[in-house]
Amino acid sequence: MQTLKMCVSVFSAQKTDEKDENALIMETVREESDNLTAYLAKLREVIRAEEHIPLQITSFDIHAALQNLVAVYRKNRQKEVNVSLDYQRTSNRMMGDRDQLLNVVSNLMENSVKYSGDIVNIHVACRDTEKEEVMISVSDNGIGISPDEQQRVWTKFYRSNAYPDMMQPGIGLGLSFVDMIVKAHGGRKMMQSEVGKGTRISIVIPQHS
């Protein structure tokens, strides 16, 4: 991977005429290199989860963490991304593996960006349940998921062919990773989706001491 990136850098440093002629090719190679790096990182996350590596459970500031994630996704340059955060809890802290839970929320937000049009509306909500749990939800205005696929999308490597025009780079690991991390916390996930209108996915994490 590093060798490929170095080759791209050298190629990009060619004379102006040559660089203009090959600019599109190099940009494509660079994008594919970045995509492959992201896929490998996602695969490592899934392998780590499957190997049952112990979660690093701590008390952390989930409010600040979600605010940071929202700020990151508002800076998306490929699309117009509007992100809102509705934090309804009285406490800013929760128990869980901070890094893994933030990876989960980031995966959900990434899917919202990928599977929406040029204008993306994402709503992140966080609240307590009546059973000493924290619920985090990510809603969007994307293409939605048909009822017959709403269980299959959690399967590792599953990729829907229902919307070929919306196919995005990926290997179908995002939601299976979400499922594994939520289960590792003893939690559960829920999905509400309507084709053509959008999707809402919620994760619920127990907070029992």
What is each stretch, according to the model?
Residues 51-56, 93-96:
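Conserved micro-motifs of the catalytic ATP-binding
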Residues 118, 186-187:
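Conserved glycine-rich
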